[in-house]
Amino acid sequence: GVPSLSPSSKTYHTYPKGGEISVSLTTNTNYTVEILGDAKEWITQPQTRGFREDILSFFISENNGDKRTGEIKIISENEETESIITVEQESYIHEGNISIRGNQKLQEIGERGYKQINGNLDILCFNNNKEDMITSLEVLNSITQINGDLILNNCDIENFNGLNQLRKIQGDFVIESLNNFNRIESFNGLDNLDEIGGDFIMKDRLPYNGEKSTVNSNFSRLKDFKGLENLKKIGGNFQLIGLGYFRYQNSPYYYTSFNELESFEGLERLTTIGGSFKISSEGNDKYVTFKKLSSLNNLTNLASIGGNFEIYAPEYEIAQLNTIELPTLKQINGYIYMRNGFYMGNKNRMNLVLENLEKLGGFECKSYTILNALKLKRIDEKLYIGVTASKVGSINAQEILNGLSSITYVGKDLRIDCSGIESFEPLGNLEFVGGDLIFDIGSSERNNLQSFIGFENLTTIGGRLIWGTGVSSAGSVSTYTSFSNIQSFQGFNNLSSIGGFRMSINYGDFSKFTSFAGLENLRQIKGDFTIEVEDSFWGLSDISALTNLETVEGSEFKIKGCYKLEDFTPLKQALTSYQGTFSTYSNGYNPTKEQILNGEGKQ
């Protein structure tokens, strides 16, 4: 008959660590086997002849290089027919994402022995088959680098053993759980991890479709970050997110998470967080998160945070976290947001001690926070102190100013709740505000300010100089009077340029205010100039300090309600070049622009 050579398969795939493959060959002739080309270096075969139905064995050497392909030729003895077998051996470097759902798939991936994954490694430990539940990552002990994300979802593991060789995660490291991760106490098993290129996030997750659990406990034994002693850099965000109470698809879900976490021990070598640092707790008095967290002190080498620094606990405070000391932190490029129980009016004072901080993106204080940053000279964006929430802002605004005494530059708005302010002297080094300078006061608050002394070095306000904005601000109707001891603008003596000027005065506010003294050096207003007064007893009678004002560039120049003001001649120089709408009414005298320019500016 016709000679026949029929291998059971034309292509064989092998793992990078090598091993043996068997080829089932059906034949009716004698044959020889030839391993072609460079494949001789990594494919060997002890048997070269057989008859009829044979099993050919080949030994595959370990592959420490790129993926490779070899060919084996089987030739009949008279060379009348031949068959080619292709052997494809994977590299220890896997190209593409790996998604693991359950233990069977985990064992299969572990058997391949990958050292590097050029993609994401996504592991969902829990599925509906409890026998296929992942309880250990031991089989992944060959992986040294993941050039994508590492996502661990809902795992019942006791530790991270199996990831002991992992040195770098190029993307995000995300650990998320719905009623799981309750056996880990630390990060033991990640001892060699020195860099996370993206985010490092641990979080409660929302339920998937079909998951019915409404009361969830996550990370319930985690005490610290031991095991991450070699981690030096997180390129993205570092976030711990506890949901507490959450409504999802019209159903309530409750979480108690991170309640044994006491410290950040284990992260002593972390120097850089490229994104934001955030601890988020949305629990209430029954479903609490971060119950024992009392310190961030183990972040002893952290020098830079590229995004925001945020403690977010709007409903129920993280009660043990009273003092945060980060002595090596020099730079926060984003904002400091401190919201520890402020919606509920909690009065747990947080002391934020950043003694070597030199650069800050911005600061919004809406909680009982004392910021000690005596080396901080520059804030690139906004500085908000106790704004819009007088019950929490007024109690510590003065203490916050005291801790910012080296500030020379605020890039955008500077907004201050003045309810608790007695002196602006700590701002004596301030030279520049790029946005608005806004003074607020609570509608049921009073203050003891005597003057604006403290702003003597301020020369430029890029935005407006504002008093009386919003409902809880100077100018609100209340049983108290706001800024009742202020008589003039003394303190702004070197101010030469502002982006606009606005005073909105209601009944009883600025009750002793009589003159614009202190603004003698003001030369330029790049926007509108408006004064609106609703108090017929208001005492402003002297604007002679505006004699040197050269230009007002806005579309509106308005003075209303200054019943004692009768002399507008100091505005003559500014009105000479003014192109907008000028109006005066309900004053002691109400001249037009033309009257002032013609020498009739005084009654």
Roles of regions detected by a PLM:
Residues 20-24:
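A short beta-strand segment in extracellular, disulfide-stabilized domains
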Residues 93-110:
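The feature captures the LRR N-terminal capping module
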Residues 1-11, 81-98:
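Bacterial Sec-dependent N-terminal signal peptides
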Residues 12-18:
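Short, solvent-exposed loop/linker segments at the N-terminal edge
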Residues 4-7, 26-57:
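Surface-exposed binding patches on compact interaction domains or structured appendages
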Residues 56-58, 66-78:
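A short beta-strand micro-motif common to beta-rich folds, especially ectodomain repeats
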Residues 98-103, 120-135, 145-158, 170-185, ...:
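Concave beta-strand-loop units of leucine-rich repeat
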